[in-house]
């Protein structure tokens, strides 16, 4: 769908906010209202227990209502609380992914900071099994593991969440791109061209956007 490298802003606010002149990723896990402004390219699903059949119904309803957009990112929150039923997870996700494909939506699973989805081998196994995509969250991975993590799941990465790192549940903005440049370089190498800035403070978002724009200009 997208030809060149692009930057989008993640809406992560209970109140919801929009930039009329910027591409947006709408976070339904913050504001559950499905907003359909033209500059919204994709959505982040609410946090659901994917072991439950009710979650399939919820995700199908979201997909039905966002037809015409590009992707839906979901958390595999199984594993955060202990052992998961991988067979059930794959069965339920396969149903959701098939429905997403029929409606022209790319289903992306996101790596998390802890639990089942913090292991790149688990993420790629699920993505390969159901034939879906991956949202590569840079800040959920320690600095010294980012390149290795990406190499394991690079074939499935569709888009990326960009910020410095997550600490105590808070996404920190980069002061510069010194720590991010190695992983940004590699993301571009594998043809991941969608960088989604996932910060909550508008000033931090705009400052990071400026740095990313300058970086992409230099990369070209």
Swiss-Prot record:
Q: State one Pfam family annotation.
A: AP_endonuc_2
Domain of life here? Archaea
Protein name per UniProt:
Uncharacterized protein MJ0008
Lineage of the species this protein comes from: Archaea, Methanobacteriati, Methanobacteriota, Methanomada group, Methanococci
């Amino acid at each position: 769908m997208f030809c060149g490298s692009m930057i989008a802003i993640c809406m992560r606010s209970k109140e919801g906010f929009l930039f009329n002149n910027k591409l947006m990723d709408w976070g339904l896990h913050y504001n559950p209202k499905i907003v359909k402004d033209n500059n919204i390219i994709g959505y982040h699903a609410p946090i659901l227990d994917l072991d439950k059949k009710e979650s399939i119904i919820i995700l199908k309803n979201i997909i039905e209502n966002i037809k015409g957009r590009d992707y839906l990112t979901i958390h595999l929150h199984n594993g955060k609380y202990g052992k998961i039923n991988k067979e059930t997870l794959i069965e339920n996700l396969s149903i959701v992914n098939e429905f997403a494909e029929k409606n022209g939506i790319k289903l992306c699973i996101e790596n998390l900071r802890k639990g089942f989805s913090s292991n790149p081998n688990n993420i790629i196994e699920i993505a390969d099994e159901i034939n879906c995509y991956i949202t590569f969250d840079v800040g959920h991975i320690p600095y010294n593991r980012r390149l290795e993590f990406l190499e394991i799941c690079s074939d499935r990465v569709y888009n990326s969440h960009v910020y410095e790192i997550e600490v105590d549940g808070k996404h920190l903005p980069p002061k510069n791109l010194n720590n991010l440049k190695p992983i940004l370089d590699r993301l571009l190498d594998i043809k991941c061209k969608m960088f989604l800035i996932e910060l909550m403070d508008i000033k931090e978002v705009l400052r990071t956007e400026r740095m990313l724009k300058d970086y992409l200009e230099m990369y070209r």
